Amino acid sequence: ALSLAFFTYNKGLPLTIRSAFFPFIKDRSWGWFGHLIDVVAVLATIFGLATSLGFGAQQAAGGLKFLFDIPNTINTQIAIIIGVTAVAIVSVVRGLDGGVKVLSNINMVLAVILLAFVIIVGQGLTIFSGLLNTSGAYLENLIPLSNWIGREDDKFFHGWTVFYWAWWISWSPFVGMFIARVSKGRTVREFIIAVLLVPTLVTILWMTAFGGSGLDQVKADVGQLANGISDVSLALFQMLENLPMATVTSFIGIVLVLVFFVTSSDSGSLVIDSITAGGKLDAPVPQRIFWATMEGLIAGALLFGGGADALGALQAAAITVGLPFTLVLLAMCIALYMGLKHEERFVLNSGK
């Protein structure tokens, strides 16, 4: 995001992935090599979003099963994907301010309400104590758990660590471009605080509150979680079941999951639309609709084609498109360093 924002707003280049490679390949950024970079970014984004949409459909279907006893089948999950995609299409047609911003604000309010509820109703002191412990443990184990040297949990490493890295990387073109698009006029310091520090702290708080509450229930042998997680998509709702107003909070949880994936789909469609339009922000509406529809179709195809191993199909898709894009990210980091050093020399020379 910082690399894209720098080369777009400071150097006057189009808001697209290829612009970050200008220090390396100069005018060839607008040739076949630049096209290849953007194609890889589009593939990573669309499969990353489709993977997320598939997981979201599984969790939402699990919530519907939990609340209303609606069977958690592939057909239910496909129906959820169709509904999410339809709302996302309406949102992308309305644009950034009319659709994406409104849904994002709704999502943020619901998330704050649910988080505050879990902290207040749950064991607040235990949660905040766990916040300090888990933060320290995270920093202590960040490097050891980031590589495979000396590890005995190969299955976990490949099924979780590698998968989530690949999944996050596949999101990077979409998230990076979207953040760059809304960050015009910010300083690098403001950017780092808003994009790195604040989300990290909020994520740690969220994971500590929900994960800590679930672990407390397991240790106290309370509820279904104490018997082990038989279905990952039900874990959130099984934890909320042991708190007051379980029906209301579970319903909010389902809505939160759905709205989150709607905002991901519509904002991702806008980003893909911008990439394929050469950085233009006002591409034709039918093009936006096409990309939003493609995300839903790919997510549905992965779930339907994966059958009983739908989760494995989603993971394979994320890893396949995410890992190659790692090279692009590393190159963008180097390009940003080169661009900032050039800017520093320019400022110093201008001062003289």
Task: Label the predicted regions.
Residues 106-107, 243, 279, 317-321:
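Loop-to-transmembrane-helix entry motif
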Residues 303-320:
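Extracellular/periplasmic helix-loop-helix junctions in multi-pass membrane proteins
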Residues 29-189, 193, 198-251, 256-258, ...:
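Membrane-embedded translocation segments of transport machinery
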Residues 111-122, 202-212, 252-274, 291-295, ...:
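Hydrophobic alpha-helical segments of multi-pass membrane transport proteins
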Residues 96-99, 179-189, 267-286, 307-310, ...:
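Alpha-helical transmembrane segments
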Residues 6-32, 98, 217-241, 268-280, ...:
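Flexible loop linkers connecting adjacent transmembrane helices
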Residues 1-9, 246-253, 315-331:
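Extracellular loop-to-transmembrane helix junctions
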